[in-house]
Structure formats: C-alpha cells, structure tokens
C-alpha cells in the first residue's frame, strides 16, 4: 500500500495533471500504440491516427479513471470495480497491456512535468499505477 508521503505526492501532482488530462490521456495512448502495436487489436473500430477524435475521447476516459483512483486512493478496488469487470469479462484485454499503459503514462508525465516527477514522485506513481493495474486485472484470477 501507499505511504502517506506517496499519497501526498500523487494527490498534489494529480491537481496539475487533471488540468491537462485530455492531452495527457491522448499522448499516453499514442505512446502505447506506437510502442506496443499489439494493443491496437482491442480497438479495431477506432481511428488510431494521432490526435483522432476517438483517441482523444478514450484518452480522456483513461485519465478520468486514473482520477477516480486518485480520489479513492484508499479503495481503488471499489472505485474501479466496473472497469475491472468490463476489461476482464467483456473486452478480455490481456493484463500485460495495463503494465504497458502504466509505463506509457509515466513517460508522458515525465515529459509534461519534468520538475515534478522526481525520483520519489516517479516511484510513488509507479507504485500507484501498479495498484491500479492490479485492480484492473484482479477479475482475471
């Protein structure tokens, strides 16, 4: 679980991130599809060209879910229960993709907030996103 210091770091950075959530979400997905093209198979109906309306809309949804997890940092499992079920039972997303997405989000955060993403903040976000990924894959077990 996260320490109090880690929760503080995540909460304070989220304030900055949330004001750019759409851009960050879109860039995160663009990175995901560029770096891990196999992830595109889950979006056969999407226009996956950089900056497309569908990519922007889904990027916004992804960051909104991260925001829900931040708001419910002590109970991420409850906050993301419906998403967990959707991705496991309906969409059947390979769990490794959540790790890839987390990595791409960290890279995007580093590019947007280089001064904020200190080693300590990077570690806190990595730990938090590992928790989020764990929640999103818990229905697979």
Swiss-Prot record:
Residues 1-141 form the Globin domain. Signal peptide: none annotated. One of its GO terms (molecular function) is oxygen carrier activity. The modification N-acetylserine is found at residue 1. Heme b binds at residues 58, 87. Heterotetramer of two zeta chains and two epsilon chains. This is Hemoglobin subunit zeta.
